[in-house]
């Protein structure tokens, strides 16, 4: 495998579910460990989750990049793949591509007061940024979260 392919975000990586919890009737949380290292994402990015024989779907990473060893996803059962994900549990494997997407401009936020506004599952992609801010609390001003 060439170095370029090895380091490509499009390369399919194996991820094992190391924890899972049904949050609501339609949302399930997963903690996933890649078999070849950390995800190395930034707040606001997403991954493509592949279930072998089912397909792929984009899902926002909801853990902070400061969390090492695994990453978290919250999945709403809305389509074929995401409904099937709700049947998965600890020990099951999924395919992961990514991270993808333009991250939040964290460096521009440094020293500023922050207001997070979200509704429903919209808090999941913000959770990555919120946890990053908590983990780097001294770098930010007042933090407020409005959840509807």
Protein language model features and the residues they cover:
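Ferredoxin-reductase
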Residues: 2-92, 148
